[in-house]
Amino acid sequence: PSPMTNSTIAASNWGFPTVIRFGPGRIAELAEACLSLGMKNPLLVTDPGVVNLPMISDAVAANNAAGLPTAVFSDIQGNPVGSDVERGLNVLRSGNHDGVIVFGGGSAMDAGKTIAFMAGQTLSMFDFEDRGDNWTHADPNGILPIVAVPTTSGTGSEVGRATVIIDEADHTKKILFHPQMLPGIVIEDPELTIGLPASITAWTGMDALAHCLE
C-alpha cells in the first residue's frame, strides 16, 4: 500500500482560473481587457499614494481615447475600512459604472474588489464575512466584472477570491469571500513597479518573501 494511504492529509480542490497578461507594456491592453468583460463605463479604484502618478492619468487617457470613459476613486486608507467601501459604492452607483478596475497595491485591490462585489447586493457588507456558507447569500448577478492591475509584488490579491476590510464597529479585520470576487483579467506589467517609491518597493518585496516562507 502507498505510504500515503493512512495519511491525515486532507483532500482539497484547487483552481487558479485567472487570465494573467504578463509583460512590459501590457498596460496598453487595459481598455481592450475592460471591453472584453463587457465594461463600457468603468470605475478605476486606486489609493492616495498612486492616484497622482503618471501611470494613472496615462491609463485613464488611454481608456478615454478608446471610447471607454473612466472615473477614478482613491479615497481609501492603507488598510481599507468599511466606510471606504461605502464611499466607493456611492461613487460607483451615482456614476452608473458597470465594472471596476483595481489599480495599485493591496489596499486598492481589497477596496476595489469589495466595491465590485457589493455593487448589487442588498445585505450589508459584513454579512458576507468568510464564515460558514455566508457567501452563498450573495446575489451573483449583482457582482460587477473586475480587471486588476497590480503595481506591487506583495499581496497577490489580484488572483484571490477574498478581501480584508476593517469593520469600524468592532475595529477588527474581516475576510469577505465569494468565488466571483476573482478578477476576470489581470494585467501584470512590471514596468508599473518602476515608478513606485523605493520604500514601497522594499516593503512589498518583504511581503512577497513572507508569503513564500509561509
Where are these regions (language model features)?
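An N-terminal, well-structured beta->alpha segment
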Residues: P1-F73
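A generic local structural motif
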Residues: N6-T8, A28-E32, E86-L89, R131-W135, ...
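Conserved active-site and cofactor/substrate-binding residues in soluble primary-metabolism enzymes
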Residues: F22-G25, E29, L37, P54, ...
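N-terminal small/polar loop signature for handling phosphorylated ligands or for N-terminal nucleophile
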Residues: V51-M125
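A glycine/threonine-rich phosphate-anchoring loop and its flanking beta-alpha core
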Residues: G120-E214
